[in-house]
Amino acid sequence: MAARLLRGSLRVLGGHRAPRQLPAARCSHSGGEERLETPSAKKLTDIGIRRIFSPEHDIFRKSVRKFFQEEVIPHHSEWEKAGEVSREVWEKAGKQGLLGVNIAEHLGGIGGDLYSAAIVWEEQAYSNCSGPGFSIHSGIVMSYITNHGSEEQIKHFIPQMTAGKCIGAIAMTEPGAGSDLQGIKTNAKKDGSDWILNGSKVFISNGSLSDVVIVVAVTNHEAPSPAHGISLFLVENGMKGFIKGRKLHKMGLKAQDTAELFFEDIRLPASALLGEENKGFYYIMKELPQERLLIADVAISASEFMFEETRNYVKQRKAFGKTVAHLQTVQHKLAELKTHICVTRAFVDNCLQLHEAKRLDSATACMAKYWASELQNSVAYDCVQLHGGWGYMWEYPIAKAYVDARVQPIYGGTNEIMKELIAREIVFDK
C-alpha cells in the first residue's frame, strides 16, 4: 500500500522520484518514534502530527494539499457565482488520483486505505472550498457501486468515475421525505424485464453535473414494511425521462451544485438495478456509517481550519492599544475551542481506526456525526464573534465557513435522528 500511495503522491506532485523516506510513526500500521499528536502541534492543520497516519500518508497529504492550493482555491470564488464547479477540475482530480483513492489500481484508483481517503476529505475542509463534491462521489456513490454492484456495473462505471469523467450522485431525499427514508414515493414498477421509474428528488448534491445517479425507489408496495420494499437503481444522464431541475439557491455551499431531479416514465433495463431487488434499505443502512463518519471528519477538519484562521486574526488585530489576542476573555475562548477540538479529533480518529478495521458500528458513527457537526457550528459561531464585524463580511474566509457549517447537522440524517439511533442502542441493547 505504501508504494501505491507514493505513486499517487507523485501524480499530484508531478515528480518522477520518490520522496525521501521519513521516520515511521507509531500507529496501527507502522512502528517507530511517537508523534506529537494534535494538542502539541504548532497548528492543528500541521502534517505529521496524528498517530493514525504513516510517513507515506504524510507525503500523500502534501500532494493533496498542493492540489487544492493550486487547482481549487484560485477558482472557488468564480464557481460560487456559477453555482457549480467546472468539469475540468473533476478531470484534473481524476488524473491526480484523488477520486476513489481506495479503489483498486486496475479500476483506476491508487489502492489506498481509508486513511488515504480521509486525507482528501480533510484537505478539502482545510482549503475552505466546499464546492467540489469529491467526497460524495468517492466516499458514498462509488462505495455503493463497488460494494453492491455487479462486475459489469463496476467495470462500466468505476474507471470513468476515478478518472473524473463520470460524476456520481445519490438521490434519496424527496420533497416530503428527508430523514424518514421509509416515506419515499419515488417508485419503480416492472414491465417485462425492464423497470419503469417515476418520482422526484430534491437537495441532490452533484445533481446538475451528475452522469450517474443512484436512485432510491419503492419496488414492492406489498412488503411487510417499507424497508423491505426499497431498491436502488443506476440512472444515467441522457436517459429519456430523466430531467434535471433547477439548481437550488442555498445559504451556504455556494459552489456545490445541488439540484432537483425528476424521473418521468424512465425505462430502465434489468442491468440498472444495483444489487438485489428490495434490498436497497439494507444497503443504505450498511453504507450510512461511512457517510456519517465522512461528515464527522469534515466537520472536525473544518473546525481546525476555523480555529487557525481565528488564531491568526486575533494575533494581528489591534484594539485598545494591543492585539485582541492579549485580552484575557479572548485567550480563554481560544483555550476552550482548542480543547473541544482536540478532544473531538481524538474521538473521530478513533472512529477512523474502527472503520478501517471494519468495526465501526452504527451508533458510534451517529455519535461522531452528531458531536462533530454540533462542535463545528459552535466553533463557527465563536470564531465569527472573535472576528467582530469583519467576520460578517463575505470576503473573510470565516464567513464562508460559518454558512457552510450549518448544513452539517442536517444532512446524512439530522442530529435529532442521530440521538434517536444512539438512544435506541442504549435502551434496547440486548
UniProtKB/Swiss-Prot annotation:
Return the CDD domains for the record: LCAD
Q: Which cysteines are joined by disulfide bonds?
A: none
- The modified positions for Phosphoserine read S54, S362
| Residues holding substrate | S179, A227, H228, Y282, P289, Q290, E291, R292, G412, G413
* Active site per UniProt: E291 (proton acceptor)
Q: List the catalytic activities from the record.
A: a long-chain 2,3-saturated fatty acyl-CoA + oxidized [electron-transfer flavoprotein] + H(+) = a long-chain (2E)-enoyl-CoA + reduced [electron-transfer flavoprotein]; hexanoyl-CoA + oxidized [electron-transfer flavoprotein] + H(+) = (2E)-hexenoyl-CoA + reduced [electron-transfer flavoprotein]; octanoyl-CoA + oxidized [electron-transfer flavoprotein] + H(+) = (2E)-octenoyl-CoA + reduced [electron-transfer flavoprotein]; decanoyl-CoA + oxidized [electron-transfer flavoprotein] + H(+) = (2E)-decenoyl-CoA + reduced [electron-transfer flavoprotein]
Q: What is its EC number?
A: 1.3.8.8
Q: In which pathway does it act?
A: Lipid metabolism; mitochondrial fatty acid beta-oxidation
The Gene Ontology biological process terms listed for this entry are: carnitine catabolic process; carnitine metabolic process, CoA-linked; fatty acid beta-oxidation using acyl-CoA dehydrogenase; lipid catabolic process; long-chain fatty acid catabolic process; negative regulation of fatty acid biosynthetic process; negative regulation of fatty acid oxidation; positive regulation of cold-induced thermogenesis
What GO cellular component entries does it have? cytoplasm; mitochondrial matrix; mitochondrial membrane; mitochondrion
Give all N6-succinyllysine modified positions.
K66, K81, K165, K240, K254, K279, K322
Q: Which Pfam families match?
A: Acyl-CoA_dh_1, Acyl-CoA_dh_M, Acyl-CoA_dh_N
- Show the transit peptide stretch: 1-30
| Localization | Mitochondrion matrix
Describe how it is modified after translation: Acetylation at Lys-318 and Lys-322 in proximity of the cofactor-binding sites strongly reduces catalytic activity. These sites are deacetylated by SIRT3.
Its biological purpose is as follows: Long-chain specific acyl-CoA dehydrogenase is one of the acyl-CoA dehydrogenases that catalyze the first step of mitochondrial fatty acid beta-oxidation, an aerobic process breaking down fatty acids into acetyl-CoA and allowing the production of energy from fats.
Record family assignment: Belongs to the acyl-CoA dehydrogenase family.
Assembly mode: Homotetramer.
Which protein are we looking at? Long-chain specific acyl-CoA dehydrogenase, mitochondrial
Organism in which the protein naturally occurs: Homo sapiens
